[in-house]
Regions:
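P-loop NTPase motor core
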Residues: 9-72, 76-86, 95, 164-285
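Cytosolic-facing regulatory segments adjacent to core modules
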Residues: 36, 72-187, 298-300
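Interdomain "pre-motor" coupling segment immediately N-terminal to P-loop NTPase/helicase cores
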Residues: 1-9
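Glycine-rich loops and low-complexity Gly/Arg-rich segments
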Residues: 86, 100-105, 188-192, 257-261, ...
Length: 314
């Protein structure tokens, strides 16, 4: 084996490092405070997002996915921690809060809490099955009901670019779906994994051990990200933190294998701040790893949980 063959022995299909540094790969803007924490946005590879309980990592992930989809960039959101319906409701609510006051097709966008979605069958009237009457009813109702009105517009401007998948459990299936979409010329610009500890590899030898499974899932997600040159935002739970550690977030906080943090391009941990009030909670984004910028910085912002929205700190 010659030296050039040796150099190319484990060389990726796409020269990711060259793309990033020599060709100036631009980060994917999320138009959230994650851009500030990462000095610009999401780069191809894994960005790990962890958070203490109820700190808002799922809300931030939904906010990121919604914002990217709203700019007509495709997002694949894989979740085993939530359902398609809940993620979609949270995304519509987030979008309604961000675009409140705007008008689309004579409908004014009014923010609503994602928990306000109608779920009582007795509130739905018995309707004539005549298609023309149903169409007229739907048209009138979306002007009278803020949730239906927002959802109708969301369906046109955001939903076509956001795929929420809650029925896929292995990295093998994830890779197959993403490569199929890419082969059809519709590769996603962003992938979200919610969350890494819940997914499997599909190999019983690996999946029987929690440590080995999490390590291999993280490794395979990294390989997918690099081979497809796509940012993957991976949510991760945290291990139990000692009182003496709570003010010093680090890569060691991620639960399971150290591969979760060390295989990543960047890693951010969310903690709760002191300020809180009706419908909001101060949170802090701690940048514990960032190959494209500074580490150790803390970005303060406000979690508005009822809307799955992250706003400026004030």
């Amino acid at each position: 084996m010659g030296f050039q063959e040796l150099r190319n022995f484990s060389h990726p299909e796409h020269s990711w490092a060259v793309d990033c540094y020599l060709q100036g790969t631009k980060p994917l803007l999320t138009h959230t405070h994650l851009d500030e924490a990462l000095n610009g946005g999401l780069m191809p590879g894994l960005t790990i997002l962890g958070g203490v309980a109820s700190a808002g990592k799922s809300s931030l992930a939904v906010h990121v996915a919604t914002n990217v989809a709203a700019t007509r960039q495709r997002v694949a959101y894989f979740t085993l921690d939530d359902t398609w319906g809940n993620v979609t409701a949270r995304s519509i609510s987030c979008w309604s809060f961000a675009t409140q006051g705007a008008r689309y097709q004579d409908i004014e966008i009014v923010p609503f809490r994602w928990s306000d979605v109608l779920n009582r069958t007795d509130e739905i009237p018995k309707l004539d099955l005549d298609p023309l009457k149903l169409s007229a009813y739907a048209f009138n109702m979306r002007k009278q009901n803020k949730v239906l009105g927002d959802a109708a517009v969301y369906e046109d401007v955001v939903a076509p670019y956001l795929a929420v998948i809650d029925s896929v459990a292995t990295t093998t299936e994830i890779e197959q779906l993403l490569k199929t979409a890419a082969a059809d010329g519709e590769a996603p610009e962003l992938v979200v994994i919610d969350y890494v500890q819940q997914f499997q590899t599909g190999s019983s030898d690996v999946d029987n051990s929690d440590y080995a499974r999490v390590s291999e899932v993280a490794t395979r997600l990294q390989q997918i990200a690099l081979s497809m040159n796509v940012p993957i935002l991976v949510l991760s739970s945290l291990k139990k933190i000692d009182a003496k550690e709570k003010d010093d977030p680090s890569l060691d906080w991620f639960r399971g294998s150290g591969v979760v943090g060390y295989a990543s391009w960047a890693a951010v941990i969310i903690t709760r701040g002191e300020k809180q009030g009706s419908g909001f909670q101060e949170i802090k984004l701690h940048t514990v790893k960032n190959k494209a910028g500074r580490t150790g910085q803390v970005t303060k912002c406000l979690l508005k949980g009822p809307y799955s929205y992250i706003s400026d700190f004030y």
